[in-house]
Amino acid sequence: RLNQKKPVLAYMGNTAASGGYYVSAYARHIMSQPLTVTGSIGVVGVRLHTQGLYEKLGVNRVALNRGEHAGFFSDMRPLTPDERTTWENLIVHAYGQFKAVVAEGRQLPYDELDPICLGRVWTGRQALARQLVDSHGDFIDAVHKLAELADLPDPTSHDIPVVNLYAKQTRHVTPQPFEMAESLVSWL
C-alpha cells in the first residue's frame, strides 16, 4: 500500500534471499549488487522427532494434550499419516502464497514462476536476467534511484544521511539501520 503513495525501493546488499526477497517483492524497484545472493523463493518445513534422542539420554518427557490435533507440532512422536498430509499441504499452500506475492509484486505470470522459484538461489546478475531485480548498483546508486522515482531533486544537492560503514573496503555497503538511527532522526 505504501508503494501506491510513495515509491518503495528495495536495495539488496550481500544477501536478500527467501524472506528478504519476500519483503522486497512489492517494491517499485529492486536493486541488487551483481553478486547479491537472492531468490530462494520456496518453503521448507522442519519437524524434528526427538523421542529416541531423549530415551538415549535417559530423559523421560511427558506431554499432555487436549484435542485430537493438539500435539501436531510436538517433537515427542512421529507424525501420523494424516498429520504428514496436513504438513505437506501447509507447505504447498505457503509456497503458493509466496509465488503469488512474487507474481503480483514483480508482475510476472504465476504459472511461469516455478523455473525461477522452487527454492532456487541466484546471484544478483542471474536475478536480473530472470526479472527478479530491476537493476544493479550499490547503496549510493539506490539513494539516487529512489530520489529519481520520488521526483526529488538531485540527492547531491541536499543532505541525505548515508552512513557507509565499509568506506575503506568497498562502495557496496550494508547499512545498519540501528546504527544509522541517530542521523536519520536528525534528518527527519
Q: Each predicted region: which residue ranges?
A:
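Intrinsically disordered, low-complexity segments enriched in small/flexible residues
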Residues: 65-68, 72-75, 93-96, 139, ...
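Conserved catalytic cores of soluble enzyme domains
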Residues: 1-121, 148, 154
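Short acidic-hydrophobic, aromatic-tinged amphipathic segments that line or gate anion-handling sites
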Residues: 31-32, 133-141
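Active-site-proximal helix/loop microenvironment
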Residues: 113-137
